[in-house]
């Protein structure tokens, strides 16, 4: 593999792992099978709980046995989760699907960036700049998928899920064919400390990095609210009188807005807009619960712009702060662990977001 092929395969493996084809219609799909709002909340809890339980063990395991193995397992579990949605379309089938998806999410969170970072170092590719490029390409690709998701759903509710399974399978195939981690890195992993010692070392790195703590505090807390609102946008649309036929196109615009957020992050001459996002973001929630179409659409624009901007900012900062590849997966899993706690806390203490 050369530098060009390394960039291309990392890009394709990431892009085809998208869930954008079924995300816009997921709530409609569950409502189609007589799921209530409280049922959807419970499924979200199952997903979060599974991610919480497996987050740290999966990161530690990735550092021990190899990130590629764990990334392959993650993609396989994601496919199994989607198959559960299609083959067992009732409450307990959905519970199983979210349980598996939560485990898959935990396996991926630490392994994916660590594995790609190791490959990029091996082939002299700057991963942080590549990741920003991938994010922009992914948003454009996801725009197309979201635009046709409701069309596929109207033909058959299962089509968006089967389409995602095909894309995930392509991503899995690409990852399987990618090189193994460097021998020196794997050798160092074999000599790494035990779980308790690793936890102390990694926590020490996080606690002593004040800039990281502030970014995590703001980004994770705020985006936790945005993520939860994303689950209930469909309910907001219904109360605002927005028809199901245009929900898909509305969701598809999220990708364009997210791409704009990345553009704002990249450009230093947008300082006023960056500060404005910070100021107006809290008011977006008031706009949402007004159920007035113009205000709802403006609120979504603000939230999606903020979501992509601050997530990209935190992602790149975390990647650049990794100074030891032998514990990089566990380091990222620890940060994801804090993220899960933040999301769960928001979910439990801010019931007003269950619009």
Task: Show the residue positions of the predicted features.
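Juxtamembrane intracellular "pre-TM" segments in multi-pass secondary transporters
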Residues: 1-2, 181-214
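Helix-loop boundary and gating motifs at the non-cytosolic
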Residues: 2-52, 211-250
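Transmembrane alpha-helices of Major Facilitator/SLC transporters
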Residues: 51-53, 249-268
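Structural signature of the two symmetry-related core transmembrane helices
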Residues: 70-83, 274-287
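Hydrophobic core of transmembrane alpha-helices in multi-pass small-molecule transporters
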Residues: 93-108, 297-310
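Cytoplasmic helix-loop-helix junction between adjacent transmembrane helices
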Residues: 101-138
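Symmetry-related core transmembrane helices of the 12-TM Major Facilitator Superfamily/SLC fold
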Residues: 160-176
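Conserved small/polar residues in nucleotide/adenosyl-binding loops
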Residues: 346-352
């Amino acid at each position: 593999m050369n530098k060009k092929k390394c960039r291309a395969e990392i890009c394709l493996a990431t892009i085809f792992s998208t869930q954008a084809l079924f995300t816009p219609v997921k709530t409609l799909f569950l409502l189609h099978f007589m799921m209530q709002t409280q049922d959807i909340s419970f499924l979200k809890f199952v997903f979060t709980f599974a991610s919480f339980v497996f987050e740290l063990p999966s990161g530690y395991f990735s550092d021990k046995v190899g990130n590629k193995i764990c990334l392959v397992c993650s993609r396989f579990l994601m496919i199994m989760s989607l198959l559960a949605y299609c083959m067992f379309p009732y409450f307990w089938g959905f519970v199983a699907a979210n349980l598996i998806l939560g485990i898959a999410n935990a396996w991926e969170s630490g392994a994916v960036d660590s594995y790609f970072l190791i490959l990029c170092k091996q082939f002299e590719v700057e991963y942080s700049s590549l990741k920003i490029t991938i994010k922009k390409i992914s948003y454009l690709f996801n725009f197309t998928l979201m635009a046709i998701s409701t069309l596929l759903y109207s033909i058959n509710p299962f089509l968006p899920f089967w389409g995602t399974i095909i894309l995930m399978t392509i991503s899995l195939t690409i990852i399987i064919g990618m090189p193994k981690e460097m021998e020196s890195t794997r050798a160092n992993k074999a000599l790494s400390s035990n779980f308790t010692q690793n936890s102390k070392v990694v926590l020490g790195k996080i606690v002593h990095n004040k800039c990281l703590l502030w970014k995590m505090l703001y980004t994770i807390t705020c985006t936790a609210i945005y993520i939860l609102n994303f689950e209930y946008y469909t309910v907001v649309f219904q109360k605002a009188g927005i028809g199901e036929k245009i929900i898909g196109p509305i969701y598809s615009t999220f990708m364009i807005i997210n791409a704009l957020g990345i553009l704002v992050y990249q450009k230093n001459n947008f300082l006023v807009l960056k500060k404005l996002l910070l100021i107006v973001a809290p008011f977006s929630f008031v706009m949402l619960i007004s159920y007035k179409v113009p205000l709802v659409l403006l609120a979504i624009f603000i939230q999606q712009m903020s979501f992509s901007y601050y997530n990209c900012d935190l992602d790149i900062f975390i990647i650049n702060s990794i100074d030891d590849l032998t514990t990089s997966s566990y380091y990222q899993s620890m940060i994801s662990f804090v993220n899960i706690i933040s999301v769960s806390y928001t979910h439990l203490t801010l019931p007003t977001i269950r619009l």
